[in-house]
């Protein structure tokens, strides 16, 4: 079933619980292999991502930049690609601000060579509303989609 290509496939590893906290990423030991990548979940800044605040500040941007720089120096600069396997923010702030957040997050990660996957749990309302695509109406939340696309360009 693998087609005999396992020796050339990329193996994605994570820190403990895919955490981006220093204690978790400092303990990651990457084997000497060109086909390894690391995936981290990084919901940051946490107060915005979790909906405890509805502002996305310059200090929040600095926090993201610092973490991306750290991940680059710890892994990418040593030959291990970095993937943000999950990130996002709940629907506490306006969709316009959330779109701006997605654009900044993705474009800033891109500067450090980091690829990102936005988390969409299919929920468009309530405390854990990470949804960006309405699965009943088959419609995107346009401002969020625009932020994602603009950040990736």
Where are these regions (language model features)?
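Acidic/histidine-rich helix-loop elements
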Residues: 47-64, 135
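Active-site region of glycoside hydrolase catalytic domains
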Residues: 1-53, 69-89, 111-112
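Aromatic-rich peripheral "rim/lid" segments of glycoside hydrolase catalytic domains that contact
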Residues: 94-153
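Acidic-and-aromatic substrate-binding clefts and catalytic sites of carbohydrate-active enzymes
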Residues: 16-22, 62, 90-99, 124-125
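N-terminal substrate-binding region of glycoside hydrolase catalytic domains
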Residues: 12, 56-59, 91-92, 137-140
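Short, acidic/polar
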Residues: 64-72, 101-106
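Residue-level detector of secondary-structure boundary/capping sites
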Residues: 6-7, 62, 96, 107
């Amino acid at each position: 079933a693998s087609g005999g290509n396992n020796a050339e496939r990329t193996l994605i590893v994570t820190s403990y619980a895919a955490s981006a906290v220093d204690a978790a990423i400092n303990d990651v030991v990457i084997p000497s292999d060109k086909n390894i990548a690391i995936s981290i979940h990084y919901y940051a800044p946490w107060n915005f991502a979790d909906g405890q605040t509805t502002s996305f500040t310059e200090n929040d941007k600095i926090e993201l930049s610092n973490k991306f720089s750290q991940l680059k120096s710890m892994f990418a600069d040593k030959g291990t690609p970095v993937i943000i396997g999950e990130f996002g923010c709940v629907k506490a702030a306006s969709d316009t601000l959330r779109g701006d957040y997605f654009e900044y997050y993705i474009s800033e990660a891109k500067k450090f060579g980091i690829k990102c996957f936005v988390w969409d749990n299919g929920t468009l309302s309530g405390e854990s509303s990470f949804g960006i695509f309405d699965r009943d109406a088959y419609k995107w939340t346009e401002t969020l989609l625009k932020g994602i696309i603009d950040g990736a360009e």
